[in-house]
């Protein structure tokens, strides 16, 4: 039975990972060892025997493990991973953070899409397996069946949910919502109140010096933020750059990349990403054939008919938050020509966007 270290299991991604491992009884298959960066010796977590928490910075403790799953973040990875490898550790490093994604000796894991790449890498002795960018993973879960077949992705318009920026940002969004509500709460309940007065108070509150923007820097509630991550010299944001870079690494196509680009915008959804996609097909393919390819790709993708009511009920963050379902809808040919396809997809960024791929990577290791 493999000794598996778990680090960062108290955070949001780590908590979802723990929940999924409990639901699927994964802990029955391993000897879990829980680590902490702040509470060494404290009460342990789940397992066959609860033991005190171990020091996540102790190279000697970490060296005793067959595999490590970390959701602790990029700073931890950057500090500990090279020291651990330099100390001669030959175990498997499974990481939800982005630090190692583009490393030559690492594989981005999304097994419903790139199981062949994962298996080939395991056979070749690769030991580093990294969860992908949440929007990229969710896009490929939705449309991965089209790769190498009739389509390529030319544009990706990402509406990014709030957890992507962190738990403190999620709390700030809720505070922003509450602040706006408090400023106008009396007026909506009064039928005699002037709607323009309500309309004036909302933006006035957003622009006030007291509006909580410590984490976002600008209002998000009742607004949007048209930029995510760092600014790059070519005009892209780093989040937009990841679309092509990580997609092609996941698919094993770095030398023959599929072009992927788009505009990434932050909106006030809590833990989901929504993506409007424009896909250029290699040839004119009937919509029915495309629907068949998408719906057969994996057990979690859900094809939503391109009708108003179905779209409103099934194709939104409110409908799928907390589920593994990845709905795809609004499929239709675009006015630019019969080789252009429009689509819209939504996914939970804490499940398929973060925790589930690393959980499933552990199971792949356990199969060997």
Swiss-Prot record:
Binding of NADP(+), residues: 10-13, 37-38, 72, 160-161, 191, 349
Keyword Transmembrane: no
Domain of life of the organism encoding this protein: Bacteria
Active-site positions on this chain: 134, 273
Keywords carried by this UniProt record: Amino-acid biosynthesis, Diaminopimelate biosynthesis, Lysine biosynthesis, Methionine biosynthesis, NADP, Oxidoreductase, Threonine biosynthesis
GO biological process terms, semicolon-separated: 'de novo' L-methionine biosynthetic process; diaminopimelate biosynthetic process; isoleucine biosynthetic process; lysine biosynthetic process via diaminopimelate; threonine biosynthetic process
Alphabetized InterPro entries for the sequence: Asp-semialdehyde_DH_CS, Asp_ADH_gamma-type, Asp_semialdehyde_DH, NAD(P)-bd_dom_sf, Semialdehyde_DH_NAD-bd, Semialdhyde_DH_dimer_dom
NCBIfam families tied to this protein: asd_gamma, PRK06598.1
Quaternary structure annotation from Swiss-Prot or TrEMBL: Homodimer.
Entry's family note: Belongs to the aspartate-semialdehyde dehydrogenase family.
Protein known as: Aspartate-semialdehyde dehydrogenase
Origin species: Azotobacter vinelandii
Phylogenetic placement of the source organism: Bacteria, Pseudomonadati, Pseudomonadota, Gammaproteobacteria, Pseudomonadales
